[in-house]
């Protein structure tokens, strides 16, 4: 189901809680909401649709990948950039890593480990920041 985007900075600034198998529908809602906003958005965290759970979705080109309880396990090659966010106005400076490795659970609750680089790594880092209440 397509959800409304949360723009409440106080809400977004609060950390999320671990996701469980009971939260699968939230992942589906993220898929629907990202699809509805695809012209202006490439990733989303569950708190952006009003749910404080550790769930994100990242556009990886031709597919959108939902990650439950994602954790960055390695990172390298730091750089500075500017980013925008559906929940905020304008763009802001931030620091990211060119390459990351992330562990997460998929829809089947199978643990995955994936190496990401460039734009996809940047999107993933932005969304994982949302989970800890960090806003660009």
What are these regions (language model features)?
Residues 1-136:
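Positively charged
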């Amino acid at each position: 189901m397509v959800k409304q985007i949360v723009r409440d900075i106080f809400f977004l600034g609060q950390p999320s809680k671990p996701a469980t198998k009971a939260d699968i529908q939230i992942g589906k809602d993220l898929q629907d909401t990202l699809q509805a906003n695809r012209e202006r958005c490439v990733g989303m965290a569950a708190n952006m649709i009003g749910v404080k759970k550790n769930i994100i979705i990242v556009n990886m080109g031709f597919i959108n990948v939902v990650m439950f309880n994602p954790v960055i396990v390695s990172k390298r090659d730091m750089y500075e950039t500017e980013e925008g966010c559906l929940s905020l106005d304008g763009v802001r400076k931030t620091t990211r890593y060119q390459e990351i490795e992330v562990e997460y659970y998929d829809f089947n609750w199978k643990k995955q480990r994936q190496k990401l680089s460039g734009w996809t790594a940047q999107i993933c880092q932005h969304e994982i920041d949302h989970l800890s209440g960090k806003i660009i």
